[in-house]
Amino acid sequence: MDERDLISRAQAGDATAFGQLLDSYYDTIFRFAWRWSRHRANAEDIAQLACLKLAGSLARYRFQAAFATWLYRLVISCAQDWKRSQQRHDHDDLYEGASLTDGSQSEDQIYLEQVLLELEDLGEGMKETALLVHAEGLSHAEAGEVLGVSESTISWRIHTIRRHMGKREARVSEGV
């Protein structure tokens, strides 16, 4: 059975088809949630929200975009909703779980977490753009479709991110 048939059957209420669809895409959902949040427990929460939202939203999928593109949008929305709910609960600790200084993370993990936090500070969509293009391997056009912006906007964001990271690396190498 091809993906379109599987989606159509799941939209019609076929629980087995929905389960197969979820099995096919769960790794993608979790991987993006983990890369976005950088903490397993948070990624599990986001993935769970995404699976629930998928169940409630699948009927609205109209095959106008690739299913994976539509699914990335859904996961990003869930991640942003999760972040807002965390901010309401605790303004001081955006990401529950391991802190930067608790010793449980490698230097690479700490560096990546710091970079992702800096990307959030650059403005809306920067973190998601970097993750979609560099971590998920989407083209600028595909990332633009997921985020609802033009390909040129994605290219500009990637340029801005690279420029910022170049300045960051210069500061790090100078010991600032």
Regions found by a protein language model. Give the residues of each.
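Structural recognition of an alpha-helix C-terminal capping motif at a helix-to-coil junction
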Residues: 31, 45-52, 65-77
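Amphipathic, Lys/Arg- and hydrophobic-enriched alpha-helical face
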Residues: 22-40, 57, 119, 168-171
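Short, charged helix-capping/linker segments at alpha-helix termini
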Residues: 9-20, 30-49, 151, 174-176
